[in-house]
Every structure is written in C-alpha cells, then in structure tokens.
From Swiss-Prot:
Transmembrane segments: none annotated. Exhibits lactonase activity. Acts in cells with perturbed membrane integrity and is possibly related to the membrane homeostasis. One of its GO terms (molecular function) is hydrolase activity. Ca(2+) 1 binds at E47, D137, N184, D235, S236. Belongs to the SMP-30/CGR1 family. This is Lactonase drp35. The lineage of its organism: Bacteria, Bacillati, Bacillota, Bacilli, Bacillales. It comes from Staphylococcus aureus (strain bovine RF122 / ET3-1). Signal peptide: none annotated. Its EC number is 3.1.1.-. The active site is at D235 (proton donor).
Length: 324
C-alpha cells in the first residue's frame, strides 16, 4: 500500500495557475488588449461606453453616478454631471443628441430611464421608477426611435428579469422575453431582425429572431446558442458591421466574440487577469468609423484603478441609431 507522500498529487500548473482559467474557449483566436486611458486610480464600476456624433466618448461610474466625457484625440476627461438617480448602468445616445441613462435604482424595483442633454440639463423621465418595477440595466435603439431594454432583476433560481420594447412615442411597453435571470447586455443586428441578450447569473446568451413588427418572435426564433462558464458571467455587448457580437465577461477580464449565428470566433484578454487584476470587464464599444474597440474594466477587488483598453476587432463598428 502506498504511503500518502507517494500518492498521485495535483499541482497548480498551466491553466490551473490562473485566477480565471480559460478552458472551453482556449483554442479560439486570442489577443491581449493594450492600455488606452486610465479613468481613475480608484476602482470605479465603469460602464455604458457610447460615442456621440462628434466622436466624443461617454461612460459612467455605476456606484457613484459620475458621468464622464472623454475626447479620444486628446484623452481629456471631463465630468459633465452626476446622475440624480441611483446606480446608473448604461448610456445610449439619441440621434437628437440627448443622453438616455438607464439606472438600476435599488436593484429591486426602482430602476428606470431618464434623458438629458450632454451637460445633464433638461432632464426628462422616459421610464419612471415610481410607476414601474423594472430594474433597467441597458438598452438599444432601433431605427424607428423606439428601444429595447433589459430588466436586471432576479437571480439564478428566481428569474424575474426580461427584455421589453418601448415604442417611439415612449408610451407603450411590450414584453419580448420574460422569466430570465438578470438580463444584462443587449444588442440589435444590423438588419434589426436579431436581438442579442446576455443573461448574467445563468451564464447564457440569447438570440431572438424577430418578425417585421420588432416585437413578435419568429416561430422557434428564441434560442440559446451559447452557455458560458465561470464566475460571474456575460455583461454588456456590441456588434460590428459584419454582425459579430462582442460580449464583455464580468469577473473574468476578457471579451468573447461571436459570429452572427452565435458561434464563438475569438476572445480579447485584459492584461493582468491571470493574477486576478482588472477582472471587472463590463463593456466593449467601437470608435465610430473604425474597427478599434474600447473596453472598460476596473480593479476594485485588488485595490487598483479603472482603465480603458483597446484592440482592433474583426470589422468596423456598426453605425447605430445616433449616427443615422
């Protein structure tokens, strides 16, 4: 009989030596992002990257409510205003120039969306937290001026979240899919026939094929083409003009890329992830007219700062509603 010291023994080596090992996607085309801009030496929950028609980048800090504006050429960072609503999570820009800010509220029932100028003036409630129970994390405009939004409620065994469509007059809210666990990122295909949604705490990617009315799901059109692995899960996403989908993986320090059918075709790693740094990667977004992708991440858990990183994607970014 073997003594204990002679028994086969597991050792930390190779992938098992990483704080966030990549297993199922290890054979994908993989690149590592380069640092682009430090937003703060403090760990801030950066989110909501979006460019206006002048090419200025807007983003926010979820927990403190700061709205940032970055000049990509000079790298100058301004803070035009602070959200008056708790826990803003996304910024989308209307083609009239207004910022639409999604906010999570108390993470239970007091989320909503407000619109404001780039300086935070002329605030208008689009979806009021007093009259709904949504916890709104993200949204995407269609070409008609309506938008889809994600309801961030629930958890893995209590799927309260969903996806809804708001008509261009902002008066009618129509459910698209419901009973999902923390609906998070959302993107619309270039032809507006496919809606992508990430379900964070269930680690799933939804592909929803829509009829021409934009709210009816095609027969057998709601599918789950991909199941993610690891902690915590998929976050915000965006598309390029080839209809590839870029999904930030929160808690993993990387972005996964899928083709238009939902097959993984590449990944982007944030530097330091194997050592447990900058794991809170939340949102990818393209610089308008280019294939240059910006990714935000922070190092709150390790006491580090908040950064924007950059790579080149497969194709130029899709020119969404604000540029039409």
């Amino acid at each position: 009989m073997m003594s204990q010291q002679d028994l086969p023994t597991l050792f930390y080596s190779g992938k098992s030596n990483s704080a966030v090992p990549i297993i199922s996607e290890s054979e994908l085309q993989t690149i590592t992002a380069e640092p682009w801009l430090e937003i703060s030496k403090k760990g801030l929950q950066l989110e909501g990257l979006n460019f206006d028609r002048q090419g200025q980048l807007f983003l926010l800090d979820v927990f403190e409510g700061n709205i940032f504006k970055v000049n990509p050429e000079t790298k100058e960072i301004k803070q035009p205003f602070v959200s008056h609503k708790a826990n803003p999570a996304a910024i989308k820009i209307h083609k009239d120039g207004r910022l639409f800010v999604c906010y999570l509220g108390d993470f239970k029932s007091t989320g909503g969306i407000f619109a404001a100028t780039e300086n935070g003036d002329n605030i208008q409630d689009i979806i009021e937290d007093l009259s709904t129970t949504y916890c709104i994390d993200d949204m995407v405009f269609d070409s008609k001026g309506g938008f889809y939004f994600t309801d961030f409620r629930g958890y893995s065994t209590n799927p309260l979240g969903g996806v809804y469509y708001v008509a261009p007059d902002f008066r009618t809210v129509t459910p698209i899919i419901q009973n999902i666990s923390v609906a998070n990122g959302i993107a619309l295909s270039t032809d507006e026939k496919v809606l992508w949604v990430t379900e964070t705490t269930a680690n799933r990617l939804h592909r929803i094929a829509l009829e021409d009315d934009g709210v009816t799901i095609q027969p057998f059109g709601a599918t789950i083409p991909y199941y993610f692995t690891g902690h915590e899960g998929p976050d915000s996403c965006c598309i390029d003009r080839d209809d590839n989908l870029y999904v930030a993986m929160y808690g993993q320090g990387r972005v996964l890329v899928f083709n238009k059918r939902g097959y993984p075709i590449g990944q982007i790693l944030i530097p330091g992830r194997d050592e447990g740094h900058m794991l809170r990667s939340t949102h990818p977004q393209f610089i308008p007219g280019t294939n240059q992708l910006i990714i935000c991440a922070n190092d709150i858990e390790m006491g580090g700062g908040s950064m924007l990183y950059t790579v080149n994607g497969f194709a130029k970014g899709h020119q969404s509603f604000q540029f039409q």
